[in-house]
Amino acid sequence: MKVLSQFVNINNSKQNILTMITSNENPVLLIVHGGPGSPDRPLVFKYNSELSKKYTVVCWDQRGSGLSYSKDDKKKELTIELMLSDLKELVVFLLKKYNKDKLYIAGHSWGAYLGLRFVSEYPQYVKYYVGTGQGISSYVDEIYKFNFVLERAKELKDIKALEKLKSFGAPIGASYSENSEYEAGYVGKLIHKYGGYIHPKSTLSMNSYFLDYIRFYKLDIFKVLAGMNYSVKNLNPQINSSDRITDITELKVPILLISGEWDYICPVPAAKVWFEKLSAPKKEFAVIKNAAHMVNFEKPDEWNKELLKIL
């Protein structure tokens, strides 16, 4: 396996891609990371490099993220539309570079939102779409999140959390603006605490996660951290004010969704409701047990197996 790192000029922005390749004959798999602003190449390299036997695996540090982060980025407004445009330019570049008509896209979390929107708009470039931790609607997801932490707090007899949750109650209405008392940040902390981000039985942990990043990026870790802050600050308000993918009811390419059974960052029940109504040439929803939002790194053997099955 060859590992290549290079900068590509995308929409007048130098963006870095890491490629794991064994043969130019293999189909291209573009990994679209989550966050926003959280490049995943250290974990993909560690846990998913097996895929390079059958795919040319490309990890993209998105605009404002990882090695692609630059202070010059602040001169241009960071929008979801710009990120989609970047993704299109990168896809066209990769297809030309590897002489392919189409490629595979695997998006995780925020990357699954970006990836699915891209596939919906530009199906002519995509052979197969894989969404891991597929968020549906920021607001609808929040209802499932609240119910999850409330039930877990009861199971674990977490009295302090129960009192806090009951003090502001479940989200109601149709948007965050109608719920000024609701504390999404607190609910998010409980999801982490209760195993909805990384499952308690997983060999992956937050400590090992961060150590992998430091070992991989070395001194560039400071650039990575700056990019995370920049991307979250600029993109999260746009993401949270949208319905994400609820308007997508039909795809022209096959789709595979993969979720950890315990994922409540992007709740599995919400994804299933949307998925059942989706029309696509072929569709499959794989749920992996004893895993949560980071299922692609918590249960890499099972996740990799799903990716290899669609070839």
Feature names for model-found ranges:
Residues 159-246, 253:
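Alpha/beta-hydrolase
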Residues 251, 257-259, 263:
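Short beta-strand/loop motif that positions the catalytic acidic residue
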Residues 100-143:
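Conserved hydrolase catalytic core segment
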Residues 51-70:
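Conserved alpha/beta-hydrolase
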Residues 126-172:
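A catalytic-pocket lid/entrance helix-loop region that shapes and gates access to the active site
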Residues 36-48:
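The serine-hydrolase catalytic nucleophile loop
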Residues 82-102, 117:
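Conserved acidic catalytic loop of the alpha/beta-hydrolase fold
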Residues 291-300, 304:
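Catalytic histidine-centered segment of alpha/beta-hydrolase-like enzymes
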